[in-house]
A protein has these predicted regions:
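Juxtamembrane "helix exit" motif at the C-terminal ends of alpha-helical transmembrane segments
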Residues: 76-102, 187-195, 201-206
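Hydrophobic alpha-helical membrane-embedded segments
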Residues: 5-33, 71-81, 113-135, 178-179
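Juxtamembrane inter-helical linkers in multi-pass membrane proteins
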Residues: 32-49, 135-161
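Transmembrane alpha-helical segments and their cytosolic interface motifs
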Residues: 57-84, 113, 166-195
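Alpha-helical transmembrane segments and their membrane-interface exit regions
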Residues: 18, 200-212
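Cytosolic/matrix-facing juxtamembrane and C-terminal tails of multi-pass cellular membrane proteins
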Residues: 142-161, 165-166, 208-232
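Membrane-interface amphipathic/juxtamembrane segments adjacent to transmembrane helices
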Residues: 24-64
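Hydrophobic alpha-helical transmembrane segments
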Residues: 1-10, 100-116, 191-196
Length: 232
């Protein structure tokens, strides 16, 4: 591995590890999309406890689970494709290298593909855990009785939100794996492309969390919803 490759890989690892702490810092200072959605989903679960018929909640959860399942299935196909090249022997690697990848030693090409595979595998594990938690939340919604005491409603709503929020956070982490896998794939065309790709992905993710129209809309919704939620 050359020095530019090593530096670009170090930058990739730095961006991967720094994204979470930076997101937490943004949440404390000015808010982030993921942090604001925690409040929105908590408000949803609180509203769910006041509904006698919870068909709409079940339908929304079912749609969310289907979305996570689609991403997980696509992720699995991508893993199979990359693993097929990586473990397919020298002929598969040489055939892949001949279609436009930067000419490099076989071991370095394997390292580049392994990085893509690692990002996808991490994303798949996040999607699987997300789907499991969403199923737990769906079961809780289905089992929720008609409650008349406000304290009981608050307790049930908090419990449901405590299941749903980590589930959707894991889903977000899985989607993030796609972005970093795309940046890792840029390494196939050279170390400079890896550096550009990971910086571009990092900046795009931060912008979407902090300054995108969706982030601003959700932040405005949080300001409306939060005063009506029970104090913790």
């Amino acid at each position: 591995m050359t020095i530019p490759d090593g530096l670009a890989l170090a930058l990739f690892v730095l961006c991967w590890l720094a994204y979470g702490p930076l997101l937490a810092l943004l949440a404390r200072r000015s808010g982030s999309l993921n942090d604001d959605m925690l409040v929105v989903r908590r408000a949803w679960m609180m509203a769910m406890t006041h509904r006698e018929v919870r068909i709409v909640d079940s339908q929304l959860m079912g749609h969310t689970i289907n979305s996570a399942g689609f991403f997980a299935s696509t992720n699995l196909l991508l893993i199979a494709a990359v693993a097929g090249i990586l473990f397919g022997g020298d002929q598969a690697l040489q055939g892949f290298a001949s279609v436009g990848a930067e000419p490099v030693p076989t071991r370095l090409l394997e390292a580049k593909l392994a990085l893509v595979l690692l990002c996808l595998a991490r994303g798949l594990l996040d999607f699987i855990w997300s789907i499991r938690q969403m199923n737990y939340a769906l079961a809780l919604i289905g089992a929720a009785p008609e409650l008349h005491a406000e304290a009981d409603r608050e307790s049930l709503g908090e419990a449901a939100a405590s299941l749903l929020n980590p589930a959707l956070s894991a889903f977000s982490q899985g989607v993030r794996g796609y972005y970093f896998a795309l940046a890792a794939a840029a390494w196939l065309f050279g170390s400079l492309w890896l550096a550009i790709g990971v910086v571009a992905v990092f900046c795009l993710l931060v912008w979407r969390q902090a300054a995108s129209p969706a982030a601003r809309a959700v932040r405005a919704s949080r300001r409306l919803l939060e005063p009506h939620l029970p104090k913790r």
